[in-house]
Regions:
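A short core secondary-structure module
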Residues: 198-203, 258-281
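Bacterial Sec-dependent N-terminal signal peptides
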Residues: 1-42, 508, 514
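Acidic/histidine-rich catalytic neighborhood of metal-dependent amide-processing enzymes
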Residues: 146, 152-235
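A common structural junction motif
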Residues: 121-122, 277-281, 379-386
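Acidic/His- and Gly-rich active-site-bordering loop/insert found
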Residues: 42-149, 170-179, 360
């Protein structure tokens, strides 16, 4: 009973029983207020306890460094925490650079239709410690914020998953619920899933029996809408760009003394090509996914701006001009090429190197063919001496079509963030999600936390951090999703059965894995 209900009950008592003495009525009012206050204190205390536990778990998880290739120790830590919370843990692969496991409300062998929360154990390097306010693997908790590599990408989400799912352990032990809920932890996402998601898809999908997945991708921001700058807007990714990593090399024999430079030499050729590439303004390309994003965004905006966004093709010049002013938004409409490495063979300062290498991190829109992209790249580089080699390339996948699981999740978002906006979109980066989309599983990329631009810019650089409030809100959203899920009947058939290992295996036993 809330405060309003207490006042109504007390007023009704006074009206119905006028013989109640004022002193007694005052005592009733005082006791009613005391009950309300006590319950309020209990709620605050429970919230504080949850916040403290969430912060502690994330801090400890951060402290176990798990730079790609060294995931096992952190994987063992978080799998132990899942067991302590009462989840059923199944280890799929167990090696230092390939630790993959599931933690579920019910054992996987029951083959219940499964809602899967996907996260990756690995993180990128912490970089230079001196650039951090607190060391990258300290897990420092300062002013209700957890600091460290992986807090946003994506150990924070893993803790949200764990806190939300484990709250249903007692209920699952007493009821035969219609769905299983599983936390899937994988390795190697930062190097495109060859030691994690790819192995799961090749060998363990029948065990998971996944009917929906939630993974990384979009996030919430409250700095988007012109007339409602405080209104949170959540972006849920239904598809994503794919990655193409390239190595450029110039191997050119020329005279070697820096005091007498020849007309052409390796570093000059490379710099000229890269200069043209980095100055080129990428073409704005509309496809069904990013047009849908603009239209959904336009529904939230008011006035002329909203009208223009809802008709992006007709107002293409205006929309393109606006996109170019926002690199984050523009990246969902362009093929990008980012120079991440540039090096020459080690020589003396006065010695001209004969070999120079550069690396490009390219992200391609789903409809872009690799061959055509490479042809355009070669034309831009403009020099036959610059060779191009593909280092790594990820696969396309069909976009996820929103279904009833999408509706359930958006309802949960709206309950925790009343009045929020929701925009389906094409994620401009690359995650493990496409592996599972290619298996026919609907995958929604979203971390339900509201982060400002300042926090989002810490991903993959120094001072990455996540407010504890974001942990709590995200946990509430996932808990609401699970609760609503259990009100539904399974509507999808299990995936067809294929052979899969029953026991933990060492990755070396999988013959097809490099």
């Amino acid at each position: 009973m809330d405060k309003a209900e207490h006042w109504f009950a007390v007023s009704l008592a006074g009206a119905s029983f006028p013989f109640i003495r004022p002193a007694v009525l005052g005592w009733i009012i005082l006791m009613s207020l005391s009950v309300v206050q006590l319950r309020s204190q209990e709620m605050v205390s429970a919230s504080d306890t949850l916040a403290s536990e969430a912060a502690r778990l994330l801090s400890e998880y951060i402290q176990v460094s798990s730079v790609t290739g060294t995931e096992r120790e952190a994987g063992e830590y978080i799998s132990d925490k899942c067991r302590e919370k009462g989840l059923h843990v199944e280890i799929f692969t167990d090696s230092i650079d390939c630790y993959n496991f599931a933690a579920s409300l019910y054992p996987l062998e029951l083959q219940k239709p499964n809602a899967v929360f996907l996260s990756h154990i690995d993180v990128v390097s912490g970089g230079t410690d001196s650039l951090w306010t607190y060391p990258p693997f300290s897990g420092a908790v300062v002013s209700d914020t957890v600091w460290g590599r992986g807090t946003i990408d994506m150990k924070g989400a893993a803790i949200m998953y764990l806190m939300a799912t484990s709250s249903f352990v007692g209920r699952a032990s007493m009821e035969d619920l219609p769905f299983n809920v599983t936390l899937l932890f994988v390795s190697g996402e930062e190097t495109y899933g060859e030691r994690g998601a790819e192995i799961i898809c090749d060998y363990f999908m029948p065990s998971l029996n996944a009917v929906v997945m939630l993974g990384e991708g979009g996030i919430g921001t409250a700095e988007l809408l012109s007339d409602e700058p405080d209104k949170p807007v959540f972006f849920i990714s239904l598809s994503e760009k794919r990655a193409l990593w390239l190595e450029l090399e110039v191997n050119y024999q020329a005279s070697g003394h820096g005091a007498v430079p020849p007309s052409d030499y390796a570093t000059r050729m490379m710099i000229h090509g890269l200069y043209d590439l980095t100055r080129r303004e990428p073409e704005i390309t509309f496809n069904n996914d990013n047009k849908g994003m603009l239209r959904a965004y336009g529904e939230l905006e008011k006035g002329l701006k909203g009208f223009i966004l809802r008709h992006p093709v007709f107002f293409r010049p205006l929309v393109a001009s606006g996109l170019r002013k926002n690199p984050l938004m523009a990246s969902a409409f362009t093929n990008t090429s980012t120079l991440t490495h540039l090096a020459s063979e080690e020589t003396a300062i006065n010695q001209i190197p004969h070999r120079v290498k550069a690396c490009l991190d390219c992200r391609l829109l789903p409809e872009t063919e690799t061959g055509r992209f490479l042809d355009n790249l070669a034309a831009t580089l403009g020099h036959d001496e610059v060779s191009v080699r593909i280092v790594s390339e990820t696969r396309n996948a069909p976009p996820t079509v929103p279904d009833h699981f999408y509706d359930i999740f958006t309802e949960s978002l709206e309950e925790v963030y009343p009045g929020c906006g929701i925009v389906p979109f094409l994620f401009p980066a690359t995650t493990d999600n496409n592996y599972f989309r290619n298996q026919g599983v609907p995958v929604y990329g979203i971390i339900p936390a509201v982060l400002d631009q300042r926090l989002m810019e810490t991903i993959h650089t120094h001072n990455e951090r996540l407010p504890v409030e974001a942990l709590l809100k995200g946990t509430e959203v996932y808990r609401g999703f699970i609760d609503r899920l259990f009100m539904k009947s399974p509507e999808e058939e299990p995936l067809p059965e294929t052979e899969a290992g029953d026991a933990p295996i060492d990755v070396s036993e999988l013959q097809d894995i490099p």
